[in-house]
Every structure is written in structure tokens, then in C-alpha cells.
Amino acid sequence: GTLPCGESCVWIPCISSVVGCSCKSKVCYKD
């Protein structure tokens, strides 16, 4: 995934994972 979700995941998981985003390099990306 290369589309940023506008969320970081340094301290907490991606809340945006509910819409298909996942944590990569401390930033949430959508696949």
C-alpha cells in the first residue's frame, strides 16, 4: 500500500485499519 491514510502508528495501532489501512514505517497506508 502506498496511499497514506493520514495517520501515524508509532505509539498506537492504525484506527483506520477498519477501512483497510495498515502500519508501514510508522505510518498508516491503504493497500
Curated annotation (Swiss-Prot):
InterPro entries: Cyclotide, Cyclotide_bracelet_CS, Cyclotide_sf. It comes from the Eukaryota. This is a cyclic peptide. Keywords: Disulfide bond, Knottin, Plant defense. There is a cross-link at residues 1-31 (Cyclopeptide (Gly-Asp)). Belongs to the cyclotide family. Bracelet subfamily. This is Cycloviolacin-O19. It comes from Viola odorata. The lineage of its organism: Eukaryota, Viridiplantae, Streptophyta, Embryophyta, Tracheophyta.
